[in-house]
Amino acid sequence: MFPSLDTNGYDLFDPFIPHQTTMFPSFITHIQSPNSHHHYSSPSFPFSSDFLESFDESFLINQFLLQQQDVAANVVESPWKFCKKLELKKKNEKCVDGSTSQEVQWRRTVKKRDRHSKICTAQGPRDRRMRLSLQIARKFFDLQDMLGFDKASKTIEWLFSKSKTSIKQLKERVAASEGGGKDEHLQVDEKEKDETLKLRVSKRRTKTMESSFKTKESRERARKRARERTMAKMKMRLFETSETISDPHQETREIKITNGVQLLEKENKEQEWSNTNDVHMVEYQMDSVSIIEKFLGLTSDSSSSSIFGDSEECYTSLSSVRGMSTPREHNTTSIATVDEEKSPISSFSLYDYLCY
């Protein structure tokens, strides 16, 4: 960048750097020589004014800039940058030379690492992985898909849970083969216990089956009854709808019939009430007639008999008084005429009185 300066092998002195010890050789040799017995006081500034004036300003500026570049290059770098530089250098060497001898040695010295963890068993450490044959692998993965599991460990857990009894039997057999006669005796007892438990379980199952069968039968019967009821109701509804379709004025007819029946009942009630009123009026009139006869001094057996006698005689006397035609037989009319002949004055007077 800047032109180099020829100094004949001597370092130039920079006044801006205080710790620089480089000076001209004559001055240094004169101070450091052991033969010199004279002690000279170190001057505050070793160069004379004539020497400094001889240098140009451009020379000093160039020297100052060169020293700044050296200082910037000697700055301590971080280890991270230093490692990066080393890696770049190695890559460049590989690109140029290919595979170096150092790389080959490093490959030979590195050992193979087992990435998968192992399990300690009775026969030593074993790998967790296992290889399955093609047929068994297909069956296994088919079962896993049927169960809907994501991992193979879950399917194996399911298989273990379903084969607990067989695993127990295997353990017992292994223990019996290792133990001897005592274990065989224990096995027999355990077998007997298992058989008794099986019998109890079978009995319970039969009971539950019978009870469930009975409940099913009762439910079926109830359903049949309900069906029959619904069928009968449906038939009745169909019959009613058919009648209404065939005779649409049936409802009006029924209403008319009911109204007629009600009218007849009202008429019968009115007739009964009128009859009772007539009887009461007759009794009242008879009482009044007896009072009038007593007042006039006319006492006759016919009047007393007509008042306190039979109902037929009372009816005939009242009919004669009121002048009504009675639908009785001839004997009643004859009795009335006889009574009138016996007492013509009383009958005449009573009739006139009543008419009046």
From Swiss-Prot:
MF annotations from Gene Ontology: DNA binding; DNA-binding transcription factor activity
UniProt tissue specificity: Expressed in axillary buds, and, to a lower extent, in axillary structures such as flowers and siliques.
Record's signal peptide: none
Phenotype of the disrupted gene, per the record: Increased shoot branching but reduced response to strigolactone (e.g. GR24). The triple mutant brc1 brc2 abcb19 is insensitive to GR24 treatment but is partially restored with regard to shoot branching.
Cell compartments where the protein resides: Nucleus
Pfam families, alphabetized: TCP
GO CC, one annotated term: nucleus
Main location: nucleus
Induction of its expression: Repressed transiently after shoot apical meristem (SAM) decapitation (release from apical dominance).
Keywords tagged on the record: Developmental protein, DNA-binding, Nucleus, Transcription, Transcription regulation
Cited function: Transcription factor that prevents axillary bud outgrowth. May also delay early axillary bud development. Probably involved in the auxin-induced control of apical dominance.
Protein name from the UniProt record: Transcription factor TCP12
Species this protein is from: Arabidopsis thaliana (Mouse-ear cress)
Gene it is expressed from: TCP12
